[in-house]
Structures are given as structure tokens and as C-alpha cells.
């Protein structure tokens, strides 16, 4: 159980992870998934309940305590150091040093290359992180987890900003970690991820534990019902809303280095979608429209 002022973020929940298992954690926004991860990684301390690893009770006062118990997390929003190299990001905090205290760069670059190649990825370890794609940055973070000998890896919405091809690459790496005996908590809103990778799935709703199922024994409709608390016959029912005149018109919107020649119009009563991968400029366009970016 975890409480914040005026909010119960976790209410007596339970979660069990087996060795070499991919266990999906699902629920709507606000269900308590992120709070549980922060408790497991030592960011928050629970008010009630216990955490056990291999049957032994542990108490995490901070993230170092969690890491010392072979737990690593890979978050949806990258936590890398963008202007440091791949090698520096992998080994930051546990660099190889000479007796004089100098960093053994050649040894670390070689080890980083070895880690990346073990995951089937040919990334130059001397490359700055800012020059990598989102998918490549996640692979570097997975390499960092492997380098720390993590036996429990938490992946928080790892496919949210990835293309179909990049998702397939992440699936391959995740399955490889599982085959090596690593236990993985996989958080995702995407049913495809869960049915493709997970052995079991646990659902939280309104900060409470709802249930745990073998993935091959729960249907998509049953899973959605567990998440929302009711039978869902239609996820997005169409409503007859008259579409009116143009409410917003954008023509040739340009901001050097961010976006170029963006044009569209939005009509009254219309839901207008603006989509693209991370870095495509979606947020910047909206900031430009709102006057936050000139």
C-alpha cells in the first residue's frame, strides 16, 4: 500500500514474478502500475506490505538498494545522458579504472561492443546517445541492465514510441533475455505486446489488484473488462455529432529545426488526430499553435 496526500496510489496490491518469466502488468492510467514500479525500484517506500526476493524480505530505501538486489528499470521516457557516448551511458557509476584512477576507455568500449553484439545490435559504442533513435537508446539501456547483471528487468511502455519494425526488434531482445533466465515485468497498453510476449498478466484497477491470468487463458474482451470494470461491447462508440465550419486553420507553419510547412484545418465538433514518432515534431507544432514556441 502506498498513499500520497488525498490519494491512495496502491491499495493492498500483490504481484508475483517467476524466474525466467515475462509478466505483463496492465491497467488504465491511474491504476497504480507506475507507483508499483517506483516502489520496486526504491523511488517510493510503501506504508504497508512486504517485498520478497527469492523468499527473502527486502526493504528498499532508495534506488541503490533496488539495484543491489539485481533490479533494473527501462522507462518509457528515456533516462539516458544524451551528450555522453553509448559506452559512458552503459558504465556510468561503475567504470573500469587503472590503479592510478584513469578510465580504461579501450576496455570499456570493447565491453560495450560485446554487450551490444550479444543483443544482436551493431551500434558504435563511441556514438553520442543524442544521435541514436529511440529504439537504439532503449537497446543501450537494456545493455546497461545486462552489464549490471540484473536478474529482474522492468520495461515501462517500451514500445510506445516505436515503429512496427522496431517493436519486432525489441520483442526479439526481450525473448532472448527471458531465454537466459532474466525475469521481466512488461508494462504496456498494447494488447499485441502482451499476447506476443507475456506468460502471465496481472491487472490493476483504481489502485487495487484485480487478478492474474495465464495469457493463453484470458481473451482480449475479458482482459479489457478486467481493466475497466465492466463489459465492453464497443471500445469507441460512434456518436452522431454534426461537423461544422472550420474552427482552426494552420498554413505553412514553420520553425527552423523543429518543423516545416505544416498545414491543416480543424472543424467544429471534429476530433483531429496528429500522429508521428517521437521527434517528428507533433508536440512542437502544438506548442507553436499555443504560442509556447515562436
Question: What kind of feature is each model-predicted range?
Answer:
Residues 1-294:
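Glycine-rich phosphate-binding loops of nucleotide-dependent enzymes
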